[in-house]
Amino acid sequence: GSYNMALSYVFPEWKARAYFERYFEDQSMLTLQYGIYDHLLGFEVELPKNPFVNSFVLEHISTKDQSGAVYHDKTASMPDKMNGRDNYYYHLLYTGWQHWGMALGHPLITSPIYNENNVINFRNNRIMAWHFGLNGQPTDEFAYRVLLTFTENWGTYITPFDDVLKQNSYLFEVSYQPKRFIGWSATLALAYDDGEVLGNSFGGQLRLRKTFNLSR
């Protein structure tokens, strides 16, 4: 589950919104007993009258703490209980929060499909990341979008990485909607991944779209 909070304020010509999400997998994080180190914190601004930057968002996310590194159940000799190592997305008996090797919900938790040993488990669920996005429409015909994500990865508490691994992702997108051809638009997107978790990769997309009204 999660605790979600947001605060928005509307100015005469722009709008700002700050939001906070605190997620949990068990009682230790539900009661905030072990702090609020793992979270999603974001800030978003909308500028509808600014053609160059219509909106931008900045987010910080951490899944690194997971209630701490120590797990100890109660015993006769040591009655104190420590509920650490929550091990997000993982489970001892089944394959965890995934479907056909792809993680569900969170795009930055490394999916099991990328495991080189072909084992269906999560080898990297302790991350810290920054995400930045902006979009704009400088003219009536052209629009753009930019997404940047930078992550640091620690593996898991049970099988940590030898070093902190970095992975960065970039997306640049341009759209063109000519006035001469009503209903037609073209979008070109280029994406690049650079890092030590998923390696380096490059991809592109070209999309042509035609919209029309059947009632006319």
For the regions a language model picked out, list residue spans one by one:
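Outer-membrane beta-barrel pore domains
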Residues: 2-3, 8-216
